């Protein structure tokens, strides 16, 4: 390649190190500070030796930990739970900590509801994310990506930059802000707010619960103000759709609009950002895969995008709550128990994927659960995310084809999001 990089290339397909079960601590934030390889090795051990196991909830300041949770680590179990919302309910929360009234004020959106109300709420915005509509905004996505990569080159004559702040972060943020009708002048504020909300617990981002609640209040107030404007000034945007929609014969309340808004801007920003970043990191580690893709970009793009999402698994887990007693793999779990669905583990399950440790851009079939396990809560923005990922890599291929990570990434300290805070890159 000829470019200086401290990223060690690897033999593609190398399994992670063995991790003894006694060393695994899903209920400790220290475990989530470990390298990805160790984490992958830990989940491989759990799939093999304890596919369903019980863990305490991580204690985060201000949050109510509540009871521990049953961790499902095998693909088939995660898939089953995703497809049986009558047993594995999204209510009252999708993270392992307990929902409190003050948190529900801002995070009580459709993602923590079950059908039929979940489906009625989802239908308000789902039209904006269909393949046909996403195809219509392709030109806008490409224009944004082209400008961001061009600016990255123009603003960094030394040909060194942080991929996250210059491309992977701004691209999905700008697109979802455009769709919501958020003015450009406010994009950076939205970016900061979403970082605090999903990065809480990471010392670089936020560990003060009062700050977390203030940011939640700020974004809620912003959403309410934007919605009030749309009540009198209709725009062709998602905020207007929320304001004008009726569910069960009633308009959404300001609180419902605010929590819906928070869900869309947070989910529409963070997950795609991390998929793009993990993708560039993987192409840096396995340069033969990049050469293969660049030589047939359009031909490989559909499978390449799916493999990047499998590899990244941007959302690490989702929680469900049992509505009845159930027995899985000989493990008895009771109504009211918390159950965690570990997508990161399911996407490396040796019983489901041939060579799961191989980053293979031509992988087919690839039934990954990177957008969730299907069913009612399948990722609403999956079509948009796929488009953004594809376009981002196409622009990199066109403008800086030899882009490579120069250092290991700064990883987000989080049990919930497989995040990267910074990834230094260079190009020739």
Swiss-Prot record:
Gene3D superfamilies, alphabetized: Cytochrome P450
Entry binding sites for heme: 379
GO terms of biological process kind: cholesterol catabolic process; fatty acid omega-oxidation; methyl-branched fatty acid metabolic process
Catalysed conversion reaction: a methyl-branched lipid + O2 + 2 reduced ferredoxin [iron-sulfur] cluster + 2 H(+) = an omega-hydroxy-methyl-branched lipid + H2O + 2 oxidized ferredoxin [iron-sulfur] cluster; cholest-4-en-3-one + 6 reduced [2Fe-2S]-[ferredoxin] + 3 O2 + 5 H(+) = (25R)-3-oxocholest-4-en-26-oate + 6 oxidized [2Fe-2S]-[ferredoxin] + 4 H2O; 15-methylhexadecanoate + NADPH + O2 + H(+) = omega-hydroxy-15-methyl-hexadecanoate + NADP(+) + H2O; 3,7,11,15-tetramethylhexadecanoate + NADPH + O2 + H(+) = omega-hydroxy-3,7,11,15-tetramethyl-hexadecanoate + NADP(+) + H2O
UniProt keyword annotations, A-Z: Fatty acid metabolism, Heme, Iron, Lipid metabolism, Metal-binding, Monooxygenase, NADP, Oxidoreductase
EC class of the enzyme, as a word: oxidoreductase
E.C. no: 1.14.15.14, 1.14.15.28
Cofactor requirement: heme
GO molecular function list: cholest-4-en-3-one 26-monooxygenase activity; cholesterol 26-hydroxylase activity; heme binding; iron ion binding; NADPH binding; steroid hydroxylase activity
Pathway: Lipid metabolism; branched-chain fatty acid metabolism
Keyword Iron: yes
Matching Pfam families: p450 (PF00067)
Family: Belongs to the cytochrome P450 family.
Function of the protein: Primarily hydroxylates the omega-carbon of a number of methyl-branched lipids, including (2E,6E)-farnesol, phytanate, geranylgeraniol, 15-methylpalmitate and (2E,6E)-farnesyl diphosphate. Also catalyzes the sequential oxidation of the terminal methyl of cholest-4-en-3-one into (25R)-26-hydroxycholest-4-en-3-one (alcohol), (25R)-26-oxocholest-4-en-3-one (aldehyde), to finally yield the carboxylic acid (25R)-3-oxocholest-4-en-26-oate. Cyp124 catalyzes preferentially the oxidation of (25R)-26-hydroxycholest-4-en-3-one diastereomer.
Name this polypeptide is given: Methyl-branched lipid omega-hydroxylase
Organism: Mycobacterium tuberculosis (strain ATCC 25618 / H37Rv)
Gene name of this polypeptide: cyp124
């Amino acid at each position: 390649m000829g470019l200086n990089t401290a990223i060690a290339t690897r033999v593609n397909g190398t399994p992670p190190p063995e991790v003894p079960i006694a060393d695994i601590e899903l209920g400790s934030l220290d475990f989530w500070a470990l390298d990805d390889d160790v984490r992958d090795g830990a989940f491989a051990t759990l799939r093999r030796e304890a596919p369903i196991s019980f863990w305490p909830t991580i204690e985060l300041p201000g949050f109510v930990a509540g009871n521990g949770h049953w961790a499902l680590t095998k693909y088939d179990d995660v898939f089953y739970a995703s497809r049986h919302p009558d047993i594995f309910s999204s209510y009252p929360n999708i993270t392992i900590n307990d929902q409190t009234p003050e948190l529900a004020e801002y995070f009580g959106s459709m993602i923590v509801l079950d059908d039929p109300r979940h489906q009625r709420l989802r239908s308000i915005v789902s039209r904006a994310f269909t393949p046909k509509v996403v195809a219509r905004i392709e030109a806008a996505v490409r224009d944004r990506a082209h400008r961001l990569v061009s600016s990255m080159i123009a603003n960094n004559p030394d040909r060194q930059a942080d991929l996250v702040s210059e491309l992977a972060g701004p691209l999905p943020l700008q697109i979802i802000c455009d769709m919501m009708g958020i003015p450009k002048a406010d994009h950076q504020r939205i970016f900061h707010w979403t970082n605090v909300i999903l990065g809480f617990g990471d010392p670089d981002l936020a560990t003060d619960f009062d700050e977390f609640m203030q940011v939640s209040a700020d974004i809620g107030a912003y959403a309410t103000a934007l919605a009030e404007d749309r009540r009198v000034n209709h725009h062709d945007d998602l905020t207007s759709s929320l304001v004008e929609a009726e569910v069960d014969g009633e308009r959404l309340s300001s609180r419902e609009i605010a929590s819906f808004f928070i869900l869309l801007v947070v989910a529409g920003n963070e997950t795609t950002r991390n998929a793009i970043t993990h993708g560039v990191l993987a192409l840096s580690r396995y340069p033969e895969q990049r050469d293969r893709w660049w030589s047939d970009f359009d031909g490989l793009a559909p499978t390449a995008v799916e493999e990047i999402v499998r590899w990244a698994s941007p959302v690490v887990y989702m929680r469900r709550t049992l509505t009845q007693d159930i027995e899985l793999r000989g493990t008895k779990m009771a109504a009211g128990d918390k159950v965690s669905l570990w997508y990161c583990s399911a996407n490396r399950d040796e019983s489901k994927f041939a060579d799961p440790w191989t980053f293979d851009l031509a992988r087919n079939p690839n039934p990954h659960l990177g957008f969730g396990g299907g069913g009612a809560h399948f990722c609403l923005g999956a079509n948009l995310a796929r488009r953004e990922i594809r376009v981002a890599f196409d622009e990199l291929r066109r403008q800086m084809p030899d882009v490579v990570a120069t250092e290991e990434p700064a990883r987000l300290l989080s049990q919930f999001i497989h995040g990267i805070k910074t990834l230094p890159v260079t190009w020739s």
